[in-house]
């Protein structure tokens, strides 16, 4: 029977990280989807361990001074956790592939989904959140990748970078698209 746990970045990167780590370390066949808004969205957009360095948020008015926790890479260090980073608006096929692979994987899986929210202050509005995800990937802000430990048993590289080479010229425009 399929088991999915869905939560936000605040619970996954910060206040609930111990629980998340415990579930992943258990080796049980459970799937976890983290909606990563990069701030505490439900309480007003405060900075968190998911907030990238330099970002301006509540409690980080001068810009966050420390780097974002790399939750996905931390999970890969176990060696037996399926991990993927997705952005549905950027690549729906990659998103579905990651979800299907996580579902089929006989152990813990963690999918981290880029999820723009109202606290990003999208100048084009939240109706363009899918477009924002696409721009985030195209400019190199957010990377699409998958780590499937089952591939090692087949003698294959378990890591797959699904993003194309970034267009760095679009990075500045991407950042300007948010308040």
Enumerate the language-model features and the residues they cover.
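Phosphate-binding glycine-rich loops and adjacent basic patches that engage nucleotide phosphates
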Residues: 32-39, 56-65, 166-169
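Conserved thiamine diphosphate
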Residues: 51-104
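Glycine/aspartate-rich loop-and-adjacent alpha/beta segment that forms the canonical ThDP
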Residues: 95-179
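Thiamine diphosphate
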Residues: 1-46, 82-83, 89-106
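Acidic, Ser/Thr-rich peripheral helices and adjacent loops at domain boundaries
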Residues: 47-69, 127-147
